[in-house]
């Protein structure tokens, strides 16, 4: 049984992960972008007529080799983990490590020497399959066309993010599908079949991944105030790349942009994906920010007071505490109160599923059910494809050129659905004007 999200898996496939990271940088000079193999691969993957390379890889392998039932169990467990993981750079990295572990385990004769390389698989393929389109989700035949329309919107805006603009003839009002019953979540708790496996208080936690993430990003502008203590760096940056943006193509932002002391890759969301105590710690911090003063003091000032007075003694892990302390007040404000993608990550993530090590016998029984598609149709905390699509294209439209009418229509629909799903953020227009 392959348990996802483990540091040991990352080190086991270090050579393959290094190849993936090498092809996840922006080129050092803009004039070389057109010939950059990683960018060409990424652009092609985002065209509306392209196929999913992960789906094609799996189909090819299964057609040539009949895998054991354990393959479907391991793959479905990874899919469940991705369903409850935040959409972040760290999630893409860990999923890439887990995916190649599954392939090498169940298809040992397949050639994986260039598994992560241009014209094979790169970060965008992991993102599209496991996080953006979620090809593994069980889908009703009645929803196929509407889902395809949402996929078109996502890839159009992601491609625009990569190139800098959306095609001039694009009309959001025509492409958008209004749906009064966007999702059918009546309960926001995990069903007993999942909670009995992952939510027991006495379960051991997997090692936290935050030190590795800090190490990989140490030379870039992300986490720039944090010092990596690694004596043996996990990864060394190649030459002729944009060091400041780091290996940013592993992130759905497809770049590292900066605005008003914030970045398009949220450091606190990366903490959620890499540290088992991050969500509880950040919830405590948010509560402290909201309740520390009774007067009408701005949120930014409240955050400033808490950071300056060193009121973070409740954080036990020194590395996590340092990362939070080194965040700007704007980054904390953006994460808790402004950014719709951050809000979705907070609401949809299950620390228990990501970081707890279940009882093997109980997990084996669960995986047999997962392999049939059970529990893979939705995230029980929140599962709204329309809201997730709007959040994604909103983030893309912050940095790529779109028409004014299109931008305002996206904001309007995003605000309406955020309110419907009780996503507590400021108006999207405000966020778009002040933060990355």
Swiss-Prot record:
The record's GO molecular-function terms, alphabetically, read: zinc ion binding
**Where does the chain bind Zn(2+) 2?**
266, 269, 335, 342
- This protein's UniProt keywords: Host cytoplasm, Host nucleus, Metal-binding, Zinc, Zinc-finger
InterPro entries for this protein: Herpes_env
Domain of life of the source: Viruses
Chain intervals for the UniProt region annotation (Zinc finger 1) = 52-135
Pfam families, alphabetized: Herpes_env
Question: Where on this chain does Zn(2+) 3 bind?
Answer: 182-183, 384, 421
Q: Where in the cell is it found?
A: Host cytoplasm; Host nucleus
- Keyword Zinc-finger set for record: yes
Region ranges (Zinc finger 2): 266-342
GO CC terms, sorted: host cell cytoplasm; host cell nucleus; viral envelope
Binding of Zn(2+) 1, residues = 52, 55, 129, 135
Where is region (Zinc finger 3) located?
A: 182-421
**Which function does this protein serve?**
Plays a role in efficient localization of neo-synthesized capsids to nuclear replication compartments, thereby controlling cleavage and packaging of virus genomic DNA.
Hey, which family's this protein in? Belongs to the herpesviridae UL32 protein family.
Q: What is this protein called?
A: Packaging protein UL32
Species the sequence originates in: Saimiriine herpesvirus 2 (strain 11)
Lineage start: Viruses, Duplodnaviria, Heunggongvirae, Peploviricota, Herviviricetes
């Amino acid at each position: 049984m392959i348990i996802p999200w483990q540091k040991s898996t990352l080190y086991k496939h270090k050579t393959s992960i290094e190849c993936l990271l090498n092809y996840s940088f922006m080129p050092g000079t803009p004039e070389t972008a057109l010939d950059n193999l990683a960018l060409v691969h990424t652009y092609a993957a985002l065209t509306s007529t392209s196929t999913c390379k992960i789906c094609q890889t799996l189909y090819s392998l299964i057609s040539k080799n009949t895998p054991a039932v354990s393959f479907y169990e391991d793959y479905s467990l990874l899919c469940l983990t991705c369903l409850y993981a935040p959409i972040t750079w760290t999630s893409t990295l860990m999923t890439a490590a887990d995916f190649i572990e599954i392939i090498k385990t169940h298809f040992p004769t397949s050639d994986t020497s260039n598994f992560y390389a241009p014209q094979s698989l790169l970060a965008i393929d992991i993102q599209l399959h496991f996080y953006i389109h979620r090809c593994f989700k069980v889908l009703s035949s009645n929803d196929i066309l509407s889902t395809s329309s949402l996929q078109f919107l996502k890839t159009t805006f992601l491609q625009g993010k990569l190139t800098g603009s959306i095609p001039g003839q694009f009309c959001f009002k025509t492409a958008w599908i209004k749906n009064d019953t966007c999702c059918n979540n009546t309960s926001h708790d995990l069903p007993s079949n999942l909670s009995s496996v992952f939510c027991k208080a006495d379960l051991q936690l997997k090692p936290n991944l935050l030190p590795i993430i800090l190490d990989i990003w140490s030379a870039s502008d992300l986490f720039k105030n944090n010092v990596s203590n690694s004596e043996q760096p996990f990864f060394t940056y190649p030459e002729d790349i944009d060091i400041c943006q780091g290996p940013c193509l592993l992130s759905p932002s497809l770049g590292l942009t900066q605005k008003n002391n914030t970045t398009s890759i949220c450091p606190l969301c990366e903490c959620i994906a890499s540290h088992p105590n991050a969500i509880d710690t950040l919830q405590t911090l948010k509560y402290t920010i909201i309740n520390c003063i009774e007067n009408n003091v701005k949120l930014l000032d409240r955050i400033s007071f808490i950071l300056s007075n060193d009121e973070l003694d409740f954080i036990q892990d020194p590395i996590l505490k340092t990362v939070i302390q080194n965040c700007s007040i704007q980054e904390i404000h953006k994460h808790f109160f402004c950014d719709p993608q951050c809000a979705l990550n907070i609401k949809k993530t299950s620390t228990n599923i990501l970081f707890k090590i279940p009882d093997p016998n109980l997990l084996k029984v669960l995986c047999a059910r997962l392999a049939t598609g059970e529990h893979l149709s939705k995230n029980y905390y929140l599962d709204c494809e329309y809201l997730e699509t709007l959040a994604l294209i909103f983030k893309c439209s912050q940095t790529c050129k779109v028409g004014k009418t299109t931008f305002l229509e996206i904001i309007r629909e995003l605000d309406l659905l955020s309110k419907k799903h009780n996503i507590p953020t400021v108006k999207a227009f405000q966020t778009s004007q002040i933060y990355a």
